[in-house]
Design a protein with these regions (language model features):
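Allosteric cytosolic regulatory segments
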Residues: 140-152
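Signal-transducing coiled-coil/dimerization helices and immediately adjacent hinge/linker segments
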Residues: 159-236
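Short hydrophobic/aromatic beta-strand element in the GNAT-like acyltransferase core
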Residues: 35, 99, 112, 124
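Intrinsically disordered, low-complexity terminal regulatory regions
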Residues: 1-67, 223-236
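Regulatory sensory and allosteric helical modules in signal-transduction proteins
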Residues: 41, 57-94, 100-108
Length: 236
């Protein structure tokens, strides 16, 4: 069976997050990688993990969100695949914080393929390897096909909300995508905007910085803000 057919079989009959998870699991099996995730990106910031092959993949994606750098973000901004065979290679030191953090997690290779939906680059398929190896040509072609298929579960979730969100960056449509694992971060960012009288971009940076400084996930910090267990002040 051709790789494309195997990818289609993996998502057959599935929808939304379930389809995204199955697609990521198939990528791990078919492309000789150790983890895979599909990220949703809006306004230049990694805003959610749509699907993953498991908890390690979600952790790798969460790091991009906390640190504000990584293959997914670069893939979307450049509208092209990002292929880093070995994060330990000094010539590949494009992410001064994310790279060393991933090496600490025993990940050497990272590869990202942009996901295009309705003419907009709104996410990426991320692949991770413990050992530094170039993607074989047929695996690279398969990853491109998988990124194209990733648009299907995205369309399931975004549906009419996607058009509202693209039409108005301030729309509540993005907050309404509650099936994403990090909806709390968007809501907490809005609370910080109201509390501190700052711009959304600055509010997100403060939330990320607090998460990184305290060794917690951005999602956990967001939940504390929403539950009023944490209030970030001017000094954060």
């Amino acid at each position: 069976m051709a790789i494309h057919d195997e990818l289609l079989a993996a998502v057959d009959g599935k929808r939304g997050v379930d389809a995204a998870d199955r697609l990521c699991e198939a990528c791990v099996t078919l492309f000789d990688v150790d983890a895979a995730a599909i990220s949703l990106v809006f306004d230049g910031a990694n805003s959610g993990t749509l699907g993953s092959s498991g908890e390690p993949a979600r952790q790798y994606d969460e790091l991009q969100f906390i640190l504000g750098e990584g293959p997914c973000l670069d893939s979307v901004s450049s509208r092209a695949p990002v292929l880093v065979v070995d994060l330990a290679d000094l010539d590949e030191a494009r992410w001064p914080v994310y790279g060393p953090a991933m090496l600490d997690l025993k990940v050497r290779g990272v590869y990202a393929m942009p996901v295009l939906v309705a003419g907009e680059y709104i996410g990426a398929l991320d692949l991770f390897r413990a050992q530094p190896r170039r993607l074989e040509d047929h695996h690279f072609a398969g990853a491109i096909a998988a990124a194209e298929l990733a648009s299907l579960p995205l369309l399931d979730l975004l549906d009419t909300d996607m058009q509202a969100a693209f039409g108005d960056p301030n729309s509540d449509a993005w907050a309404d995508l509650h099936t994403l694992s990090r909806a709390e971060v968007s809501q907490a960012t809005g609370m910080l905007v109201a509390q501190l009288g700052i711009e959304p971009a600055e509010a997100l940076v403060r939330l990320r910085a607090h998460a990184y400084a305290t060794g917690r996930s951005a999602t956990d910090v967001a939940r504390d803000i929403l539950d009023r267990r944490l209030r970030l002040g001017e000094e954060d």
